[in-house]
C-alpha cells in the first residue's frame, strides 16, 4: 500500500484502482512521505474519498491530531458498546464537533444543551457512551467537558447508528418532545422530576408516538370503554393531552388520534401524581 499524500501522523491518502482512499492507524504515516509503503496490518480504517469524505481529508490536515485520535477512540468504544458499526460520516462530524468543544472550553465558553434531559431519557446507551467520552477527554487532555457535551456526543452517535434518519430528523424529534414536555409543565404549573421513571416512560412514549405519526404508521388503539374511563377519572390530565394534540396539529401538521391521547393521559397522570 503506497502513500499518495501524508495527511497527519495517523492518516494518509492512497490511490487504488484510480480511486482515492483515506487510510488510518496509529502512527502509520509518522516520518513517512509520498510513495513510502504502509503495512496492511497497521491499517485500522479505510475510507473511499467521496464528497463527504473530502471534508474529512481536510479535517485530518487542519485539526489537532490528538482531537482526531480522541474522536476515533470514542467511535471505536461506541461501536464496541453498541455491537454495530457506525456510519462513515461520524468520523467527520464527531472530530469537528469535539475539537470545537475543546477549543470553546479552553477559551472559557460554555454552551448549554437545552435538550440534555430529553437526550438522557431517549438515548440512554448513547448518553452513557457520551459520559465515557468526556471522561476520556479529561483523562487524555486534562480538559473537563461539561455534561452537556455528553448529550451532544450521544446525538452524534445515535445519528450514526441510523440508516434512514438524519441528524436533522433526530434533533427535530427531540425538540418536538421537549416542546411537549414544556407544555405539560406549563399546564400543571409545576416542576417535574426529570430523573424519575415516570418521566422517562413519558418521554419514551412520546418518541414512539411522534415517530409513528410522522411515518404514518398505526398507533395502538385503546378500548373505547377504557378511553371513556380515563377521560372521566383523569379529566385534567386528559385535557392536557388534548392540548398536546392541538399543538402537534398546529405546529407540525400531525394528527394525534383520540385513543393515543388516552395513552398519553396515563403517562401524564403518573408524572402528575409523582409531583404532588
UniProtKB/Swiss-Prot annotation:
Superkingdom of the organism of origin: Bacteria
Organism the protein comes from: Bacillus subtilis (strain 168)
Family listed: Belongs to the transcriptional antiterminator BglG family.
Keywords from the UniProt entry: Activator, Phosphoprotein, Repeat, RNA-binding, Transcription, Transcription regulation
Function as written in the Swiss-Prot or TrEMBL entry: Mediates positive regulation of the sacPA operon by functioning as an antiterminator factor of transcription.
GO biological process: positive regulation of DNA-templated transcription
Span of domain PRD: 62-167, 168-276
GO molecular function: RNA binding
Activity regulation summary: Activity may be regulated by phosphorylation.
Disruption phenotype: Deletion mutant exhibits a 10-fold decrease in the synthesis of sucrase SacA.
Record's keyword annotation contains Phosphoprotein: yes
Entry protein name: SacPA operon antiterminator
Amino acid at each position: 500500500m503506497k502513500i499518495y499524500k501524508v495527511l497527519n501522523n495517523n492518516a494518509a491518502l492512497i490511490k487504488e484502482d484510480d480511486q482515492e482512499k483515506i487510510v488510518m492507524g496509529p502512527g502509520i504515516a509518522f516520518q513517512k512521505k509520498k510513495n513510502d509503503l504502509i503495512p496492511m496490518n497497521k491499517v485500522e480504517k479505510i475510507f473511499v474519498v467521496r464528497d463527504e469524505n473530502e471534508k474529512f481529508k481536510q479535517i485530518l490536515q487542519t485539526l489537532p491530531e490528538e482531537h482526531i485520535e480522541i474522536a476515533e477512540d470514542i467511535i471505536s468504544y461506541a461501536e464496541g458498546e453498541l455491537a454495530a458499526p457506525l456510519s462513515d460520516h461520524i468520523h467527520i462530524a464527531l472530530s469537528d464537533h469535539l475539537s470545537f468543544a475543546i477549543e470553546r472550553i479552553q477559551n472559557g465558553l460554555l454552551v448549554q444543551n437545552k435538550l440534555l434531559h430529553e437526550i438522557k431519557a431517549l438515548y440512554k446507551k448513547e448518553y452513557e457512551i457520551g459520559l465515557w467520552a468526556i471522561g476520556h477527554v479529561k483523562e487524555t487532555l486534562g480538559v473537563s467537558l461539561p455534561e452537556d457535551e455528553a448529550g451532544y456526543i450521544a446525538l452524534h452517535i445515535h445519528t450514526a447508528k441510523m440508516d434512514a434518519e438524519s441528524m436533522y430528523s433526530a434533533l427535530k424529534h427531540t425538540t418536538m418532545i421537549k416542546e411537549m414536555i414544556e407544555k405539560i409543565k406549563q399546564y400543571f404549573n409545576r416542576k417535574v422530576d426529570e430523573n424519575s421513571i415516570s418521566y422517562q416512560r413519558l418521554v419514551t412514549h412520546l418518541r414512539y408516538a411522534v415517530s409513528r405519526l410522522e411515518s404514518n404508521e398505526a398507533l395502538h388503539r385503546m378500548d373505547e370503554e377504557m378511553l371513556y374511563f380515563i377521560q372521566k377519572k383523569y379529566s385534567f390530565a386528559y385535557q392536557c393531552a388534548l392540548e398536546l394534540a392541538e399543538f402537534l396539529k398546529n405546529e407540525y401538521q400531525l394528527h394525534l388520534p383520540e385513543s393515543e391521547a388516552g395513552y398519553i393521559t396515563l403517562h401524564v397522570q403518573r408524572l402528575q401524581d409523582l409531583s404532588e
